[in-house]
Amino acid sequence: MLDAASMIMKEEIYRCDVGRFNSQTFAYVAAFGLFTDVSYETSQDLKNILGHLAYVLEGAKRLLDIKAYHMKVTTENGVIEDNFIYGMITNSRSVGGFKNLTKDVDMNDGLFEVTLIVQPKNPLEMQEIVRNLLNMEDNSDLIYSFKARKLTVEAEEEVAWTLDGEYGGSQGW
């Protein structure tokens, strides 16, 4: 805390990318889908008692009801349209306590790291997704991973988003 105050007093400026989500901003992550509501849906009492394990237990409940969203994601490099169970636009080396989910992160390059996970069609594809995530193999037929300066996300239904770990509202286009 003292270091932060000292930096402010010295006017040392650290520039970093900030995202815009409609009328809101985010510095860390904008995400939808599987597990993204865990940070704000886990009860404070449970967090106080169990700490990080509270998030794990709350997340485990989500595995019984995996919802997919049909979306069209447009960037300066093209269009991706598919059914996704998870997506994140981030500017961080770790998300939700998981380190190195994104690679080659530069927090002031004007680019965001994007990860989109396609709805698996069967248990083998779900296993492949988990294996790829654990092995940090981020580009496959089931996981899109890329950098983008700007994204437009369109969905056929309302989709709940989290912005920097807080509820960011539901959007449909």
Annotate the PLM regions.
Residues T75-N77, E81, D106, L116-W173:
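ATP/nucleoside-binding phosphotransfer catalytic cores, i.e., glycine-rich phosphate-binding loops
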Residues L46-A54, S94, K103-L124:
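Gly/Ser/Thr-rich active-site loops/lids in small-molecule metabolic enzymes
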Residues A31, F35, M88-T102, Y167:
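Glycine-rich phosphate/pyrophosphate-binding beta-alpha loops
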Residues K10-D17, L63-H70, F146-A148, V153-E157, ...:
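A short, compositionally biased
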Residues M1-L53:
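Small-residue-rich beta-alpha loop regions that form the catalytic core of phosphotransfer
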Residues T36-V38, E81-N83, V95-F98, N122-E125:
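Short acidic/glycine-rich loop or secondary-structure boundary segments that cap or lie
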Residues N48-E76, I80:
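Accessory alpha-helical/coil subdomains and C-terminal extensions
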